[in-house]
Amino acid sequence: MAIDKIQSESINLADNFAFTGTVTGAGGANTPAFHAYNPQNGSVANQTEVIVSNNTELLDSSAAYDTSTYKFTPQVAGYYFLYANVRYQSGTTDFDRINLVITKNGTDILSARNNNKDYSTVCVSGIVQANGSSDYFQMKSYQNSGGSISITTDDEFTYFGGFLIKKS
């Protein structure tokens, strides 16, 4: 006997269900998505802000991240979750300030700050809106330690990524 309509009162929503057909309207695609990291040591001068050169892609589903300009330019309008992480290797130097910023079209929109010594890590994340054509996002960092220090490299320490969470 086929069931065409089920009353909502007769279903326990806490149960597990096994479907044999196609389920539509559940979930969605989280693309474009990207994740890029910096595999090479780079020295950052004291009191200097730089665009972080994450030039190696782990993921770029829609060719929206440029490894030469370090820009994420999504071609789908919507809301995106973006994240960034940077780690400085300083030995025993005390930092006056380390900033990590995600910019939209060159303007700071998400930022975090840390005052620390030794290995200092800063991360930032948030939800941003993109128009799907000309908006672009970059990751930049500033350090004020009294001297030049290196950004720690590898995909687990310095990276930039994001993905679509809702089309607009």
Locate each region found by the language model.
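A short, structured loop/turn motif at beta-sheet edges
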Residues: Q75-A77, T103-T107, Q129-Y136
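Beta-strand secondary-structure signal
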Residues: F81-N85, N99, S125-I127, Y136-Q138, ...
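Short, surface-exposed beta-strand/strand-loop-strand elements in extracellular ectodomains
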Residues: T93-T107
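Terminal (often C-terminal
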Residues: A18-Y79, Y83-D94, A112, G147, ...
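Residues that act as N-cap/strand-start positions at coil-to-secondary-structure junctions
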Residues: K5, D66-S68, D96, S120-V122
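Short, surface-exposed tryptophan/glycine-enriched loops
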Residues: Y119-Q138, Y142-N144, T153
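Register-specific beta-strand positions within repetitive beta-rich fiber domains
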Residues: M1-G27
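Solvent-exposed serine/threonine-rich low-complexity stretches and specific carbohydrate-binding patches
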Residues: L110-K117
